[in-house]
Curated annotation (Swiss-Prot):
EC number(s) per entry: 1.4.4.2
Modified residues (N6-(pyridoxal phosphate)lysine): 267
The protein's name in its UniProt record: Probable glycine dehydrogenase (decarboxylating) subunit 2
Highest taxon of the lineage: Bacteria
Pfam hit, one: GcvP2_C
Keyword Oxidoreductase recorded: yes
Subunit structure: The glycine cleavage system is composed of four proteins: P, T, L and H. In this organism, the P 'protein' is a heterodimer of two subunits.
Cofactor(s), by name: pyridoxal 5'-phosphate
Family per record: Belongs to the GcvP family. C-terminal subunit subfamily.
């Protein structure tokens, strides 16, 4: 398929500007030449060319609208279209973030309602909606932990414990906040090794970051005991909320002793992934961390809703304005639509994952056969390496059959990992079809491994030389032509 640049023809236009209704000036008379911008080298195409080009491109995409996207730890569920219609109403789109509070009381009410619902669902004392994404929420959570220890004079607490199965953002966020990292091993059941945790839990530990269910899709059964041991030493428990889709409506992390957790609205509450944003990663906290929340907090005094800037020990502001309002609205609509039945989200997410894992029994190696999965599971393709086939080959071959691939090679503690999360929005027929395709691919691996090693065969872009592509980045169309 041609690139949009290859469709360009000099002089072809897709727009017409209105006639100038003010006096024309020569900008060169007012600005020195070094400040003048050069004309951008945009492709010259008609409007119809653009519409056809991007419509055709969209038909080549793998997306939730066209197929199942079983990316583990991503929760690629269906995003209700009515929510998009809702947030595109001019009453929401045209509100400036500096509009005085008295003119936006209904909107502040909606935001306050979302905050209260997240507090209830998470079992927390308070929630900040401000973070712009999950990793941003992580950063805020660690800033709150840092502020807590500084306030209490715990200058020695500079270590954050992180499981070896953790998301990569966990150690990155902790390091950005100035903490040292110590890794805690997983045990043979795929849970945090409690003995190793206790051994590394000394007076220097500020917090433990844990995901529950963890990235293996396994529930951390000792979560309450972990919280108790941390609190005995005035250390805190951070829970990564990436996998909250397995818990929502059934469990409240705050009741386990979790001190801080970020919610991924794009996962659990169906605000869309991708497109570079905007996202939202609200953070729920226990009473311990409530005094340090960022400003402003949205409050209600019984008569009006307002932005509270008067939080004495606040870590300050972490976003230019107040947060991503339209994303909040989508999450609020999603929660209100389910109401008290929101627990069905987690029930069906877990049911679908367990059913799909059952359908794939014996197809790949199960690294933790004794542990039931929650909303996702990890299998290992090490049983195919003797045929010269790796997990990445399996993933690329899946594309030929119309499904997107699972997450590969994560978590790092499982060799040749395939991390699969079907979400609650897929039906049993889709799961059966996906399982049949994987069985067929494994049969191909054993009988005709070259098919997998050269896959994909039916996608617009075939197999790329990944190592070469990483070393020799081509980021511009002109570089391709040269």
């Amino acid at each position: 398929m041609e690139l949009i640049f290859e469709k360009s023809k000099k002089g072809r236009k897709g727009y017409k500007l209105p006639e100038l209704d003010v006096e024309e000036v020569n900008i060169k008379e007012y600005l020195p030449e070094e400040y003048l911008r050069e004309e951008l080298d945009f492709p010259e195409v008609s409007e119809l060319d653009v519409v056809r080009h991007y419509t055709n491109l969209s038909h080549l995409n793998y997306a939730v609208d066209t197929t199942m996207v079983p990316l583990g730890s991503c929760t690629m569920k269906y995003n209700p279209r009515i929510n998009e219609e809702l947030v595109n109403k001019k009453e929401f789109l045209n509100v400036h973030p500096l509009t005085p509070e008295e003119y936006i009381q209904p909107l502040l009410k909606l935001v306050y309602e979302l905050k209260e619902l997240l507090k209830e669902l998470g079992g927390f004392a308070e929630v900040s909606l401000q973070p712009a994404a999950g990793a941003h929420g992580e950063l805020l959570g660690l800033l709150l932990i840092h502020a807590y220890h500084q306030d209490r004079g715990n200058k020695e607490k500079k270590v954050v414990l992180i499981p070896d199965s953790a998301h990569g953002t966990n150690p990155a966020s902790a390091a950005i906040c100035g903490f040292d990292i110590k890794v805690v091993k997983s045990d043979k059941k795929g849970e945090l090794d409690f003995e190793d945790f206790i051994k590394k839990l000394d007076e220097r530990v500020a917090a433990l970051m844990i995901t529950n269910p963890n990235t293996l899709g396994i529930f951390e059964r000792k979560i309450k005991e972990i919280a108790e041991e941390l609190h005995k030493r005035d250390a805190l428990l951070y829970m990564d909320g990436a996998n909250f889709n397995a818990l929502v409506g059934r469990f409240k992390p705050g009741e386990w002793g979790v001190d801080v957790m970020h919610f991924n609205l794009h996962k659990t509450f169906s605000t869309p992934h991708g497109g570079g944003g905007p996202g939202a990663g609200p953070v729920g906290v226990s009473e311990r961390l409530k005094p340090y929340l960022p400003v402003p907090q949205i409050e209600y005094d019984g008569k009006k809703y307002y932005l509270n800037w008067n939080i004495e020990k606040s870590v300050g502001k972490i976003l230019a304005f107040h947060g991503h309002f339209l994303v909040w609205l989508k999450a609020l609509a999603y929660i209100l639509t389910y109401g008290k039945d929101i627990k069905k989200v987690s029930e069906y997410a877990v049911l679908n994952a367990r059913y799909l894992k059952h359908l794939l029994k014996g197809v790949f190696k199960d690294p933790y056969p004794e542990s039931p999965c929650m909303h996702e599971f990890v299998l290992s393709a090490t049983n195919l390496t003797k045929y010269g086939v790796r997990a990445s080959d399996v993933a690329k071959r899946i594309l030929d059959y119309g499904f997107y691939a699972p997450t590969m090679y994560f978590p790092l503690i499982v060799r040749e990992a395939l991390m699969i999360e079907p979400t609650e929005t897929e039906n049993p027929d889709t799961l059966k079809k996906f399982a049949l395709i994987l069985r067929k691919i494994v049969k191909e691996a054993k009988e005709k491994p070259e098919i997998l090693k050269k896959a994909p065969h039916r996608t617009p872009v075939r197999r790329i030389k990944e190592a070469e592509a990483n070393r020799n980045l081509i980021l511009k169309f002109k570089d391709i032509k040269e």
